[in-house]
Amino acid sequence: FGKKDSSSVRTGAIAIFFQSVLFVGHLLDYLFWHHSAALNFFSDMISQGLQTEVMRSFFLLSSLLVSIIGHRYLCRKGLKSGEFHHLTMLATAGLMLLCQSNHFLMLFVALETVALCFYTLVAYNRDSAKSLEAGIKYLIFGALSSALLLFGIVLLYGVGANPEAWGASYPEHESMDPLSFHYLGNLMSE
């Protein structure tokens, strides 16, 4: 973080170029070499199908547009843009993993990756007191919501006894499982 130097414009242009190549490559892969069957990777924690490909394309296009608009803003404000583009691409990778996650652990890790990038991007302008205040507030609210999400994941794991996202519906259990009513009662009492 710091003031603008001569390589800031070049760094942003290189990042935007590679994001464009990545988006076009992914779009060509989706349109011409699309795999019809759903694929699972990483011990079935990641699922790749038609819906995830559409969402990945959306996230790549959004990242490209954010980088173009953000680069203009950073040049106008006189801030370095190298870290901005790295954080944008890391957040994009986290969002792509988030839409592909098929397991609560992968969902949580991907969501936290995105959140950490967003915390830093919110407080990117270190010369602005408002930017730093917004970053701290976002960090505090994000930590609180992350804890609540983790408690919810543990609750679903306790009821379903399966950490997979689709396994949490627990079709093998009876519909009148007393354990589920116990957890629901504890949730409602708070």
Predicted features along the sequence, with ranges:
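Alpha-helical transmembrane segments of multi-pass membrane proteins predominantly involved
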Residues: 1-190
